[in-house]
Amino acid sequence: MIIPWQQLDPETLDSIIESFVLREGTDYGEQERSLAQKVEDIRSQLQSGEVVLVWSELHETLNIMPRSQLNAGGHAPY
């Protein structure tokens, strides 16, 4: 189930994004980016619709994933 990020308290959204960035350990190439920069990158992707917040009822977890990975019903494939 997609969770509308716009309806979350800004501090809650920041915490969710920060947790995701720390958990993912994404490689940003040759130049290391700060946590704040990575959080802003994800926030921009949420605003553009490139990624979405997804609640998994099966796993009872919240994740951020590319919109392109959702199935036709708008749900995560797990």
UniProtKB/Swiss-Prot annotation:
It holds the Pfam family UPF0270. Gene3D superfamilies: YehU-like. InterPro entries: UPF0270 (IPR010648), YehU-like_sf (IPR036685). Belongs to the UPF0270 family. This is UPF0270 protein ECA4061. It comes from Pectobacterium atrosepticum (strain SCRI 1043 / ATCC BAA-672) (Erwinia carotovora subsp. atroseptica).
